[in-house]
Curated annotation (Swiss-Prot):
The gene is tyrS2. Belongs to the class-I aminoacyl-tRNA synthetase family. TyrS type 2 subfamily. PANTHER family: TYROSINE--TRNA LIGASE, TYROSYL-TRNA SYNTHETASE. HAMAP family: Tyr_tRNA_synth_type2. NCBIfam families: tyrS (TIGR00234). GO terms for molecular function: ATP binding; RNA binding; tyrosine-tRNA ligase activity. The keyword Ligase applies. One of its GO terms (cellular component) is cytosol. It comes from the Bacteria. Its EC number is 6.1.1.1. It catalyses: tRNA(Tyr) + L-tyrosine + ATP = L-tyrosyl-tRNA(Tyr) + AMP + diphosphate + H(+). Catalyzes the attachment of tyrosine to tRNA(Tyr) in a two-step reaction: tyrosine is first activated by ATP to form Tyr-AMP and then transferred to the acceptor end of tRNA(Tyr). The lineage of its organism: Bacteria, Pseudomonadati, Pseudomonadota, Gammaproteobacteria, Vibrionales. Residues 334-394 form the S4 RNA-binding domain. This is Tyrosine--tRNA ligase 2.
């Protein structure tokens, strides 16, 4: 194992909150492999880069020699996590959950080492609780405590219904930590209430409380909202290499550093050197290319990463796209013709429609086919003719 100082530095990389750090240091000083848990309810079949932020941290614990368990919430997935929701989630069938779980396993092993990963399902112990066990579990908390949760508080104040089983969700997730005697649990910042519930239940059951490590939510391609499919600002881990490459290259230079910190496995010293290089005048685009290739190689292959880079170069570099160009931001739902006019690439929507019809308007190197089309959320390079360019963000 690495020294405690080196291990702690790697563990804390990109972390939003660590509760409490002194307990983690004490556990590391015990010199044994710690039991690390990450739970996920398989509510959707595919994961995107936002999901991988925590998986990367789990991999870091593996590389440091700790015992890692990826817990699939097949039981809690049928209950439905109410976190951040303003209405009750529709329950999933067991068939839905198990089908999604199989896809999850295939995708997480692109990051985690299969030989060092234990996969468990929480139905193993939650199904055995029975009515008496559920009542005893519920007795650990009060309705007042549950209403401290921001999402429950808002729904209660707004007269929105809260189902009784939703109150049980944090307790069930917390009980997972009791059943597994977890040392450290990972989660997103939106999971704080549930993660701390694990600490409380472990104390109530005579166990040492787990350390809670929370990772920030990855900002999506729009540079504003968290990455999600609903916001259409995501990069799926199963997307084609060329699609992934183009999307990563579209993020802002400032956002690139956040992606490096949360998605890259490069040493911290190397990232510091990258920042120094950019400060000294190196083009951030070159650094962004390395990020895109690293991520594509992880989910596809190095050959795919090289091919995606070459395709990108062929599409953009040969069009002689300038590094500097006007930048604009428009709301989602804006038609192509309006974008071209408002970005001053055309004098009017009529001219914009004419340019599209003539094949003279391009978006990311591809001809715009429909002047009424509405681009998805993201950042694109628009070109009209040979010399007019604009970088447009749809948010």
């Amino acid at each position: 194992m690495a020294s405690i100082e080196a291990a702690l530095a790697e563990i804390k990389r990109g972390v939003e909150e660590l509760i409490p750090e002194e307990e983690l240091i004490a556990k590391l000083k015990e010199g044994r492999p710690l039991r690390i848990k990450l739970g996920a309810d398989p509510t959707a079949p595919d994961i995107h880069l936002g999901h991988t932020v925590i998986l990367n941290k789990l991999r870091a614990f593996q590389d440091l020699g700790h015992d890692v368990t990826f817990l699939i919430g097949d039981f809690t997935g049928m209950v439905g996590d109410p976190t951040g929701k303003n209405s009750t989630r529709p329950p999933l069938t067991r068939e839905d959950v198990l089908r999604n779980a199989e896809t999850y396993k295939q995708q997480v092993f692109k990051i985690l080492d299969p030989a060092k990963t234990k996969i468990q399902f929480n139905s193993e112990w939650l199904s055995e609780l029975g009515a008496e066990g559920m009542i005893r579990l519920a007795a650990n908390q009060t309705v007042a405590r549950m209403l401290e949760r921001d999402d429950f508080k808002k729904r209660y104040a707004g007269g929105q219904p809260i189902a009784i089983h939703e109150f049980m969700y944090p307790l069930l997730q917390g009980y997972d930590s009791v059943a597994m005697e977890t040392d450290v649990e990972l989660g997103g910042t939106d999971q704080k209430f549930n993660l701390l519930m694990g600490r409380e239940l472990q104390k109530a059951n005579g166990q040492k409380p787990q350390v809670v490590l929370m990772m920030p939510l990855l900002v999506g391609l729009d540079g504003e909202k968290k990455m999600s499919k609903s916001a259409n600002n995501y990069i799926g881990v199963s997307e084609a290499p060329s699609e992934m490459f183009g999307k990563i290259m579209s993020i802002s230079d400032d956002l690139m550093w956040s992606y490096y910190e949360l998605l890259s496995f490069r040493p911290l010293e190397e990232l510091a050197q990258f920042k120094a290089d950019v400060a000294a005048g190196k083009n951030p685009r070159d650094i962004k290319v390395l990020l895109a290739k690293e991520i594509i190689a992880r989910f596809h292959s190095e050959a795919d990463a090289d091919a995606a880079e070459q395709e990108f170069v062929n599409r953009f570099a040969k069009n002689q796209i300038p590094d500097e160009m006007p930048e604009f931001t428009f709301a989602a739902g804006t038609p192509m013709a309006n974008l071209l006019k408002e970005a001053e690439l055309c004098s009017s929507t009529s001219e914009a429609m004419r340019m599209v019809k003539q094949g003279a308007a391009k978006m990311d190197g591809e001809k715009v086919e429909d002047a009424k089309a509405e681009p998805a959320v993201g950042t694109y390079v628009f070109q009209v003719g040979k010399r007019k360019f604009a970088r447009i963000t749809i948010a």
